[in-house]
Amino acid sequence: MSHILAIDQGTTSSRAMVFDASLSLKSVAQEEFPQIYPRPGWVEHDPTDLWSSVAATARAAVERAEIDGSLAAIGITNQRETVVIWERATGHPIHNAIVWQDRRTADLCQSLAEAGQEPMITERTGLLLDPYFSATKVKWLLDHVEGARARARRGELLFGTVDSYLIWKLTGGRSHVTDATNAARTMLFDIRRGEWDAEICGLLDIPMEMLPEVKDCAAPFGMTRADLFGREIPILGVAGDQQAATCGQACFRPGMMKSTYGTGCFALLNTGAERVTSRSRLLTTIAYQLGGQRTYALEGSIFIAGAVVQWLRDGLKIIREAGETHGLATASDAAQDLVIVPAFTGLGAPWWKPDSRGAVFGLTRNSGPAEFARAALESVGYQTRDLLEAMRADWAAGAEGVLRVDGGMTASDWSMQFLADIIGAPVDRPVVRETTALGAAWLAGMQAGLCPGPEEFAAGWALERRFEPRMEAATRDAKYARWGRAVRAVMAV
């Protein structure tokens, strides 16, 4: 039987998984890498760490699967918006990667907004003027690395999101490409026409010579170096992490929603061929592109989801492992009604306040680790409801009323029950929770002719558990109103 390698390059770790042609998981390898915080609000990665962790985990996963040379295709999924610029001749990065969480270009975004540029940018890219996206990060690098812009104009430097950089490394510098979903997150790509936007590139003084070729999500992206896996292997599927999860969750029908809980939380609502312009400051993006046909989505992005649990562990040191939050939340005094607004790197959708900072409301002398754990987990549910309320307001034909979930936090039954309670809708957790890697594997497998098309793949999606709302409507509304007051207070400071 043929096998597929899925590379999942995330914000805090790189993972690789081997699937067989029926998309059953055969092996997993994972490796964390350092986070770099040069200044408050700045977040960087060393691109060599990204590459070395990907190469190591890919080899390890293939070895553990014991597949005897039957590797037929590679799919890649990745943290989006993160920016790498490297030398064409050597492949060496000219600076650390600037990560999607980084806020250093907030002033630049503000000045562009004040100059009246946001409506044009939003109309073409579907995105808002925010440091989250790649474009202003690229400009910052070209402005601050000596000689970079001139070198880029001469064709000596290349830009890419993480997928593009990894493909360059995997292919030994033979392929400078990306896919439509990653391109759509740069704020340089016209999602209406499916091409790089010359006017926006000119506005930011970004030479178009450094941009990668854009392909479908299932397409030939290049062949790996023979020394990596013993022979050349085709890279046949690429999608940004949230779009890969959308595919892995089989959200192919307009109106279907999924929400992924990792470092951040990202909810996507499939809007089909309709490019819905948000009135609620959500993002209009490409869900996936197959056969040259773009399927669009509304997306809401929360910067801090699983990261709030990391804060409990690494910042407050009230837990040693993430799994401890479940027991603490269950044992907490719900009457205290503690509220945490985890705006550690600003507020994401639908607020988009990069300068806001986190706060805790309702502290008493009896507030302890259990109450903090409960409030931290609840904050993720509240933020998800913020996104879903905005989606429902934007698209009358929208949300079917069931939310499909995936990601590390979904292992917590307590968190998923609270999520169902606070959004007032069923939450479906799939049997296969590695939906991001699954989506990448499916894209590559479909292109290789090993896996079925969307309709047949969707028919095989399996439910592990449905969480139905149990909370009384009056309680739900009161708790959500309290959250709203807390968010407004944070934005007012």
From Swiss-Prot:
Inhibited by fructose 1,6-bisphosphate (FBP). It is an enzyme of class 2 (transferase). Glycerol binds at residues 80-81, 132, 241-242. GO terms for biological process: glycerol catabolic process; glycerol metabolic process; glycerol-3-phosphate metabolic process. ADP binds at residues 11, 15, 263, 306, 408. One of its GO terms (cellular component) is cytosol. PROSITE patterns: FGGY_KINASES_1, FGGY_KINASES_2. CDD domains: FGGY_EcGK_like. This is Glycerol kinase. It comes from Cereibacter sphaeroides (strain ATCC 17025 / ATH 2.4.3) (Rhodobacter sphaeroides).
